[in-house]
Amino acid sequence: MERLAGKIILLSGASRAFVGFLAGLLAMFAQPPFGIFAAAFISFPMLVWLIDGVATHPDEGVVRRLLPAASIGWSFGFGYFLGGLWWLGNAFLVEADLFAWAMPLAVVGLPAVLALFYALAVLVARCLWSDGVGRIAALAVGFGVAEWLRSFLFTGFPWNAIGYAAMPMPLMMQSASVLNVATINMLAVFVFAAPALIGTGKGARVGLAVAAALFAAHIGYGYYRLSLPPPQPLTPERTVRLVQPVIDQAKKMDDRERAVIFEEHLALTAAPPQAGGKRPDIVVWPETSIPFILTDNPDALARIADVLQDGQILVAGAVRAEDAGTGLPPRYYNSIYVIDDRGQIVGASDKVHLVPFGEYLPFEDVLNSWGLSSIAANMPGGFSAASNRSVLTLPGGRTFYPLICYEAIFADEVDGSARLSDALLNVTNDAWFGDTPGPRQHFHQAQLRTIETGLPMIRAANTGISAIVDARGVLVVGLGYNYKGVTDAILPGKMPTMTDSMLRGRIFWFTGVFLLLVAAISRRGLNFRTN
């Protein structure tokens, strides 16, 4: 281990950047669909040793002293995000004649931009760097700050946060009932990076002992929580049917296929109950599953009424149109409708957190003012964002907290009012991304919201992964990717959580300050010995 550490420490220039890239790429294998937990225990020690090799001189300017560290962080981040987000390019091939030109911007450009956050992480860490366990704490602080900023800056994109690598299965997800993802990010980096101490010796006993204790607590708490009785269904029980139609995205966008698509959803809705099961009370369709403006098609509402049996409720993703006033084009919302057995819309909720460049064009007014209206007109999007999230109340009193598409990756989208609901509802359409890691990563991140909130999740996805997940993050029923069909299950009940979002936020700041003090004291000790 010492020999390997020495070789990595002595790297410089392009060799150092390339190894940083490989370390980031390796770290990505700890995320879904691979979930190779051990990969992070190799990649982060490599990162520590690369930073160890950054030599600075007092007579150099601040930029020259910090730039090598930032470049290491950027190389690591570029490998990590390129390996984890390449599948975004699939979306640009659905209408390749219009958008294939933009594919490199997503596949290479987005990882290059996101890598700047990890450049910042290493930059912060390098300012506090020392030669013992303090540098492990410094790296944890740096990544904690970077991942926290990534969760909200520029509308936020916390996809594949480092902490998810420490939670590959429900057993290792239970810490999220106590800590938020931001805290888990920091502690995960500390644990992943601690083996670097073996390669350099100093502080190894203390650092590895702390890392082992954190890891043991993480696993032990998971065993404890999963050993508790599973949450019991609320009374009266409600059976939920998930419809997974597997409609190709190109077909969804073909106007000639609209009627066929609608009838496919209805046929799956009307399928008989599964063997030994009861008739579903609630049927859930995926995001934008209704292929037209439903309020403009009374015949479609009548068809829904024909298919639904007495007392059944349909919850379906749809595009909702709203009159914007005389002479103005209508506003469109990515929405969820609740429809009763008479074909009446009895509830609706609109998406709050839209996808930049996918559902709306940032700075569209600026582009138009610069005379670039043709670019704005040819970009995807056109949705308006809701000003607030409306909880869906179903006939009979059940309440669902809606999360449309990638809203489910944002822990902060689920506020305190969610606990008043009976379940989280996530509808999505991942057909854009094909059979790639993307849909698996999306499901994994959505799954964690159940443990944070103590609520079960109902998840309907066009091409998968559709599932009902209980409040412990355990899969009750599910449909794999590209499996066309339905699955029914009784909706599980709630489960208490150890902390609320406010307390978790305080724990994050306390943990960050504590690690910062450890790093600062170690740094001060290094300076004292040097002088």
Curated annotation (Swiss-Prot):
GO cellular component labels: plasma membrane
Top-rank EC class of the record's enzyme: transferase
Record keywords, A-Z: Acyltransferase, Cell inner membrane, Cell membrane, Membrane, Transferase, Transmembrane, Transmembrane helix
Active site (record annotation): 287, 351, 405
Molecular function as annotated in GO: N-acyltransferase activity
Source domain of life: Bacteria
Principal subcellular localization: membrane
Residues annotated as domain CN hydrolase: 243-493
Bilayer topology term: Multi-pass membrane protein
Transmembrane segments: 8-28, 34-54, 74-94, 105-125, 128-148, 178-198, 206-226, 501-521
EC number(s) recorded for this UniProt protein: 2.3.1.269
InterPro entries referenced in this protein's UniProt entry, alphabetically: Apolipo_AcylTrfase (IPR004563), C-N_Hydrolase (IPR003010), C-N_Hydrolase_sf (IPR036526), LNT_N (IPR045378)
Subcellular location per the Swiss-Prot or TrEMBL entry: Cell inner membrane
Pathway: Protein modification; lipoprotein biosynthesis (N-acyl transfer)
Any one biological process term the GO annotation gives: lipoprotein biosynthetic process
UniProt keyword annotation of Transmembrane present: yes
Keyword Cell inner membrane: yes
Pfam families: CN_hydrolase, LNT_N
Known role: Catalyzes the phospholipid dependent N-acylation of the N-terminal cysteine of apolipoprotein, the last step in lipoprotein maturation.
Similarity section: Belongs to the CN hydrolase family. Apolipoprotein N-acyltransferase subfamily.
PANTHER family, per database record: APOLIPOPROTEIN N-ACYLTRANSFERASE
Protein name: Apolipoprotein N-acyltransferase
UniProt organism field: Sinorhizobium fredii (strain NBRC 101917 / NGR234)
Gene from which the chain derives: lnt
